[in-house]
């Protein structure tokens, strides 16, 4: 997913070279509707994030930042060998449209020592979802909903955060995301990338945390996970920590392996979303720890762990009158 969503696949230009641009913000301002006019660029700034070789072009790739903004740069192979985050560069080349946002195709890269990484911009999920922050260095806070190592051959360390307005996947280059405690509150600093459609429209953002940039746990998971009745989930309460895990208990009434589990408690039912493939038996009593969310008709549970308690008699079905 990460490589497929990088904003370059041979970015297009359609007109003769125009004036030279000297800031990243000027290059980004070329994006938008209308014909893209090629400009030469001469930029001075730092490597913000080291990336893998672009799979569609074979060019080296990195995120580059000056005081005005940051941008994706594609460079001829070998030009940035040995360079790292924080190295100060002069980049010469052309501005190109890119597949989502403007990029720079470098013809020359000159190392000039070490520079300062610009501070991250504090953002909300709603701001990220617009696509406007694609490629930018940002800071955002949320609650860890899951953390894992991606399945081979993917080697990414991933965490998924619940943030006001949505959910954000975080990929940390040094692996720390996969060990974040579920239900902890964290502050994450990284570079925004955007999943986008074939027509270049924003679908969903994700964040890449550079090597050496810590993910800060601002609050560990609550020590006690409160037990709630199914019919009181998401009901008014002046206590508790909104957005954190809860526990429920119920009897299994239906199971779709790897997808959903339906529970009932005193004639009140709930759907539990599953990622595991374990089999459950109708009539089995279980305890579920996870996050309550609003479903189409009633609360549901996501990102759960399930504890088997006992085998009981299935609940009696409700008789519907016609």
Listing of model-derived features with the role each one plays in the protein:
Residues 16-322:
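OB-fold single-stranded nucleic acid-binding module
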Residues 1-11:
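Bacterial N-terminal signal peptides
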């Amino acid at each position: 997913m990460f490589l497929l969503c990088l904003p370059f696949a041979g970015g297009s230009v359609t007109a003769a070279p125009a004036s030279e641009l000297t800031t990243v913000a000027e290059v980004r301002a070329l994006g938008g509707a209308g014909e893209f006019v090629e400009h030469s660029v001469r930029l001075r700034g730092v490597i913000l994030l080291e990336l893998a070789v672009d799979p569609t072009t074979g060019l080296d790739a990195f995120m580059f930042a000056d005081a005005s903004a940051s941008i994706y740069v594609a460079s001829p192979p070998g030009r940035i060998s040995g360079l790292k985050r924080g190295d100060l560069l002069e980049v010469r080349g052309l501005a190109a449209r890119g597949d989502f946002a403007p990029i720079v195709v470098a013809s020359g890269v000159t190392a000039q020592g070490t520079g300062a990484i610009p501070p991250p911009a504090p953002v909300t999920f709603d701001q990220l979802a617009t696509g406007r922050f694609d490629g930018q260095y940002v800071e955002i806070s949320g609650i860890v909903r899951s953390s894992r190592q991606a399945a081979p051959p993917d080697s990414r360390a991933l965490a998924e955060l619940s943030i006001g307005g949505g959910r954000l996947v975080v990929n940390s280059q040094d692996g720390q995301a996969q060990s974040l405690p579920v239900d902890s509150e964290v502050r994450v600093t990284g570079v925004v990338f955007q999943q986008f459609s074939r027509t270049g429209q924003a679908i969903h953002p994700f964040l890449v945390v550079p090597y050496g940039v810590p993910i800060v746990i601002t609050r560990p998971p609550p020590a006690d996970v409160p037990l709630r009745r199914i019919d009181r989930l998401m009901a008014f309460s002046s206590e508790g920590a909104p957005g954190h895990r809860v526990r429920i208990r119920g009897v299994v009434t239906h199971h779709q392996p790897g997808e959903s589990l339906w529970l009932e408690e005193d004639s009140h039912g709930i759907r539990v979303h599953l990622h595991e493939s374990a089999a459950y038996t109708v009539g089995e009593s279980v305890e579920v720890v996870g996050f309550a969310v609003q479903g189409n008709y009633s609360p549901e549970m996501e990102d759960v762990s399930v504890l088997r308690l006992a085998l009981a008699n299935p609940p009696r079905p409700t008789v519907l009158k016609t």
